[in-house]
Every structure is written in structure tokens, then in C-alpha cells.
């Protein structure tokens, strides 16, 4: 019996690099930053979000600043 062909996963493209003028990463933009936080309150990994290394670093810094300013929670409220 023949094996099924192995598919490579589709490469994710950094949304910030793709559309440069659309959005900048700012700690006050909580709706954007919530997309990069898991339901447990952790910052999602690069391989999950598809961001490039520079923009992933910027997102992480913005999330940490927003947490410090009490705009985002450190942990989730779900139990």
C-alpha cells in the first residue's frame, strides 16, 4: 500500500511585515495585543503567531508594558 504524500505546513507570514503601513505595535492597543496572548495569559510563540523575530520581540515588550500599566492581566481569570 502506498504512503500518502507528506505535506509541508504552509509558511505563516508576519502580518506586520506584510502590511507595513497598517499597524504599529503599541502597548495601549489592547485589542491587537490580546490576539497574541493565550487564554492562560501567556504570550504566544513565534511559530504559532507567524511573526518575524523583530516583531515578535516588539509584541512581547508591548504586552509586558501593558501588563505593567494594568491594561492587560498577568494571568487569566478562568479556572
From Swiss-Prot:
It comes from the Bacteria. GO terms for cellular component: cytosolic small ribosomal subunit. Keywords: Ribonucleoprotein, Ribosomal protein, RNA-binding, rRNA-binding. SUPFAM superfamilies: Ribosomal protein S18. InterPro entries: Ribosomal_bS18, Ribosomal_bS18_CS, Ribosomal_bS18_sf. GO terms for biological process: translation. GO terms for molecular function: small ribosomal subunit rRNA binding; structural constituent of ribosome. The keyword Calcium does not apply. Belongs to the bacterial ribosomal protein bS18 family. Part of the 30S ribosomal subunit. Forms a tight heterodimer with protein bS6. Binds as a heterodimer with protein bS6 to the central domain of the 16S rRNA, where it helps stabilize the platform of the 30S subunit. This is Small ribosomal subunit protein bS18B.
